[in-house]
Swiss-Prot record:
It comes from Anemonia sulcata. Disulfide bonds join 5-55, 14-38, 30-51. Residues 5-55 form the BPTI/Kunitz inhibitor domain. This is KappaPI-actitoxin-Avd3c. It comes from the Eukaryota. One of its GO terms (molecular function) is serine-type endopeptidase inhibitor activity.
Amino acid sequence: INKDCLLPMDVGRCRARHPRYYYNSSSRRCEKFIYGGCRGNANNFITKKECEKVCGVR
């Protein structure tokens, strides 16, 4: 699995409300979260499909 996918979900420090997806290593699924728009980490994908492709979800 891509190491970025193992990072914890991080909403970032800003207050925008961007719908994004992250890989939840506990459920082994890509799940929706609201991204604040800045900072955060690499476990942050614009689409569920992109998250699933990068993180190897089947």
